[in-house]
Amino acid sequence: MTSLINADTSGGLKITSDTSGTLEVQSAGNTKLTVGSGGTLAAGHVVQRPFVYHTSATQLTSAGALSELSTSLRVSITPTHASSILFLECSAWLCSPNSINIHWAHFYDVTNTEVPFLPPASGSRKRVHWSIRISDDGNNDFHNMIFTAAGTAGSTDARTYTIWHGTEGATAEFLASTLSSATGVTAPIVFSVTEIYNP
């Protein structure tokens, strides 16, 4: 049996918890949402998750020094809580045909002109969120560019994140391979920013 609660008044809907002070929303006997006695989410719950799912039949290329991969990959977020954890995730297919090169990538905070949540410095090493050395085999040298980063929001100020990519010189192909035969592909780039409540 399905129960529907409809709050169609300007006063909204008020649900009162039991004497424990904790309110739980359940589905099929499993707790899906817990609101504490202070009226806040329990730690670990997702507050919001803006994302971009970018596809195109037009090839996107990147070569040389680290730079923004595409302005179409920008994701904006205004954290609800300064103490929240922001979890950035990128998943992309790439092709680096017939090349032996190192590739790098990192997230970038466009608003504050900085690379967020970097690993510590160590000598002259590049500080990045992802790297790979690609060996040449053919025109369809396919690889995955999957990386994450996480850190405290620090404030509730709006900010916009994007993805930067670079190589030692080879040209990387995204979204669509040069080969248009059945062995070529078109594939998406997915970028999301998840705010996780962390009181």
Question: Model-found features: residue ranges?
Answer:
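Intrinsically disordered, low-complexity regulatory segments in eukaryotic proteins
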Residues: S10-S17
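Short, solvent-exposed loop/turn segments enriched in Ser/Thr/Gly
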Residues: L69-T71
